[in-house]
Amino acid sequence: MPCGCRSPDFYAMKTRKLAFCGIVACLYAVVTLVTSSFAYGPIQFRIAEVLCLLCLFTPTAIWAATLGCFIANLFSPLPLDLLFGTLATLIGCIGTVKCKNKNIWLLPLPVILSNAVIVGIELAVAFYTRELFWTGFAISAAEVAIGEIAVLYLLGVPLMQVLRRTPAGTYLRTL
């Protein structure tokens, strides 16, 4: 290859990663919007959060889930979600990548904790007075954590266990 030129495989890989990001981001946004009656608010069961665990297979999923979360949060009744909800997803996904060689039951913890803390603060700021901030934060963080635990442990971990054993999981590791 001449100096400065890239192989066709390099461009094919970039295209596959970009397509993967687009598909996962779209899935995240669509699933959140279809389930919006219970995907937003203090007690939320955001089924699309399962896609954050795809970071187990490829770090490319960090950007895919974060973009999907941002798009979904464009429709949130709480404008602060655009910044704080998206930040919580980004931090949770990065934490998942850092934990990927650990026990599969520990994988959801970064996503659960980042959402509970960051979205808990967001909800406390939005819905509680200054005097009740810490009480509001504790309540909001617990509510968000309960929803995240339910979704990630009841749907996410079993799905990741299945993906680990299938050709799809092997393919995802190549991205």
Question: Can you annotate each of these PLM segments?
Answer:
Residues 3-5:
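Cysteine-centered motifs
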Residues 12-56, 60-63:
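Hydrophobic transmembrane alpha-helices
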Residues 37-42, 50, 70-175:
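Membrane-embedded alpha-helical hairpins and interfacial helices in multi-pass inner-membrane proteins
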Residues 67:
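Short, structured active-site "lid" loops
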